[in-house]
Amino acid sequence: MKLAFRNPDILQVLPFREWLREKMPSGRDGFVVEDLDLVVRWFGRNYGYDSRGAFMLMDLKFGSAQLGIAQEKTFGLMDGLLRQADPDFERYLGFFLIQYTDEDWDRAQFRINFKGVTHQQFMDFWSRRFVTEPYFK
């Protein structure tokens, strides 16, 4: 299968999503298909959780690309429902937008929810030693 690219942030076109977009009504008609980049789960003693753990939802964007309107609404809906189910953030830690400047992750600069972070803060974010506010408040 040959990968196709059409997005401004140079993400591959997912064939099944494109097929759905061709066959189903458009966003103007009330049907939206989005893909979420990452669900990250921490569990066990190393992170202070039981075997079920806790998780975050994340979307990655290249450069200064932002969530589109449909993504804002879709991911915001998911976030709101998950927050209702876990208002104290015991299991659901929130939604995060990760912006990066280079696909060489050792050279890239990063922003988490539009805030620039150092490379060390970015690495600490993944191990839960650096905590920042979720995207949706």
Language-model features, listed with the residues they occupy:
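A structure-centric signal for secondary-structure junctions around beta-strands
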Residues: 30-35, 52-54, 92
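Short acidic loop-to-beta-strand element that houses the catalytic metal-binding Asp/Glu
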Residues: 34-41, 46-48
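Short, solvent-exposed loop/turn segments that connect beta-strands within catalytic domains
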Residues: 44-53, 85-89
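Conserved catalytic cores of phosphodiester-cleaving nucleases, focusing on short active-site segments
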Residues: 38-40, 53-63
